[in-house]
Regions:
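N-terminal intrinsically disordered, cationic/polar leader segments
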Residues: 2-105, 110-159
Length: 159
């Protein structure tokens, strides 16, 4: 079963967005390679701001030290979070849009452990573990905005 306990002494150190550029431009968008302790969602937001992305879709895989997933409770109108440690990010997919002038990252993912047990859900936080995490970002021409749907209090992508 996936580890839900802290296993490293360096866990109290803050995760970080990379001080150096960890991506290259491609014909369709960007290829990003993140390294140990990088904040995946923060790095994607930083890319969106730096490169002035209108919107984008992305897929990724790699190794994570910490993955926090949330399952949205429509009664409480909030995510129920669960954190897992030291796992393979078997798959991640998501979108980059804008909300209140800032990048809004929406991602879902699946992580697995050495016994191939897997869990997944809405990504609330991802910290890269030992090794790397690779993300292919496909840029879109149209700027997309995310807004809170008042009925369910959840962020919804507008077209």
């Amino acid at each position: 079963m996936l580890d839900q306990t802290k296993t490293r002494s360096d866990d109290s150190a803050p995760i970080q967005t990379s001080p150096r550029k960890r991506y290259i431009k491609t014909k369709a968008g960007f290829l990003m390679v993140l390294r140990h302790r990088d904040d995946v969602l923060g790095c994607l937001a930083q890319l969106a701001e730096t490169e002035k992305l209108a919107s984008a879709s992305f897929v990724g895989m790699g190794f994570v030290h910490r993955a926090t997933f949330g399952f949205y409770d429509f009664v409480k109108k909030a995510f129920d979070p669960k954190t897992f440690y030291d796992a393979e990010l078997a798959s991640m997919t998501g979108t980059i849009a804008w909300q209140n002038g800032k990048p809004s990252i929406h991602a879902h993912g699946v992580v697995s452990d050495a016994s191939f047990a897997a869990v997944g859900g809405h990504v609330l936080e991802l910290e890269v573990g030992t090794g790397s995490l690779e993300i292919t970002i496909t840029a879109h021409d149209q700027r997309l905005e995310r807004e809170i749907d008042p009925g369910i209090q959840a962020n919804i992508l507008g077209l």
